[in-house]
Amino acid sequence: EMPAIIVPRKTVNELQKLLKNSSGEVSAQVSETKINFSHENISLTSKLIDGKFPDYNRVIPSNNDKRLSVDAKAFVQCVDRVSAVSNERSRAVKLSLANDSLTFTVSNPESGSATDELGVGYSADSLDIGFNARYLLDITGQLDGDMAIFELADSGSPTLIRDEQDADALYVLMPMRV
């Protein structure tokens, strides 16, 4: 059985680049301080991060009763458009949900405001919630499926984001005040 380890993000990103056009199995050998990945003529060795992996199950919300179903590509386009006027420091975008409608709003005293609207699957109580636009784009840009599923509770609780076509893809995003 594989021991619990923490592999540096830089190593994972490098491995992805090296294996981008490859297929087949990748073997991993783990020592107390290092990991080695090998595939055909590729070998990558990295130090492991010293420490205990956090209990991530504690941060995955389980009582989010509001469900938003949205076309992932259209969502990315809307966030990208309205965030063009956000300030670089906060990058806050407000999402307003009501009756199968999602309104995106960004207000910036220096560059004005922007609003966009999208038809979505949402039938729960109205909700206004804010997120960092960069984080929304990073997460929804990773989804392989056509639909993104957001499971929400309220404007101050973590949101669960899922890829409708990949049951293993699970993202937790903390909201921000807007």
Locate the predicted segments by residue.
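Glycine-rich, pocket-lining loop/helix-strand segments that form or immediately flank
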Residues: 52
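Short hinge/gating elements
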Residues: 59-61
